[in-house]
Amino acid sequence: MANVTLNVTDAKGQATGTVEAPEALFGVSAEDVQAHIPLIHQVVTAQLAAARQGTHATKTRGMVSGGGKKPWKQKGTGRARQGSIRAPQWYHGGTVFGPQPRDYSQRTPKKMKAAALRYALSDRANAGRVAVVEFGITEPSTKAAVAALAPITADKFTTVVFTRDNINEWLSVRNIPTVHPIFVDQLNTYDVITSQYVVFTKEAFEAFVAAKTEPKEA
């Protein structure tokens, strides 16, 4: 399989070279990506569901205090029969079929998550919206980060991927409204599809490719 060529730029946004990205990670065809949109949707839905707190709660008529006494006798008053002032039709009565605490998380196989990420990255790469940047930042500087990203992303919303050693670069971009910084071991399908551009640092790109392509020890 032929690899995908990604541009590498410097701190001023000038092209300095290219890197070869594995086709399996960045070069899936547009037709194949289109065919797997349901998979991407399922993985993203599961990710968003897992992020839900699920602590919502309402009280049923059995949980609301009071209401243990029948408000008036069954017959002879001319009024509608009532058994409790905490029945749902009463003011301050219990809630019927209201939300209760629950776990929204779904089980998603690792292979499905990995495949969805490949398709999402390939979709961005097919559109020319994946790049590698060498920031060269030695101390936190938002101005320097903007100068490096602007020629590539044109101020569109961008996910920038770092290694945990790229702390100065991470600190430099975290205050940019159109940038979502993320560490390479946290890269996921949702953050890719919600961004118009995906930018890797050189170290993050190498770490990502190595983690996805090198065989794991038994």
UniProtKB/Swiss-Prot annotation:
Transmembrane segments: none annotated. Residues 55-83 are annotated as: Disordered. GO terms for molecular function: rRNA binding; structural constituent of ribosome. The gene is rplD. GO terms for biological process: translation. It comes from the Bacteria. Keywords: Ribonucleoprotein, Ribosomal protein, RNA-binding, rRNA-binding. One of its GO terms (cellular component) is ribonucleoprotein complex. One of the primary rRNA binding proteins, this protein initially binds near the 5'-end of the 23S rRNA. It is important during the early stages of 50S assembly. It makes multiple contacts with different domains of the 23S rRNA in the assembled 50S subunit and ribosome. This is Large ribosomal subunit protein uL4. Belongs to the universal ribosomal protein uL4 family. Part of the 50S ribosomal subunit.
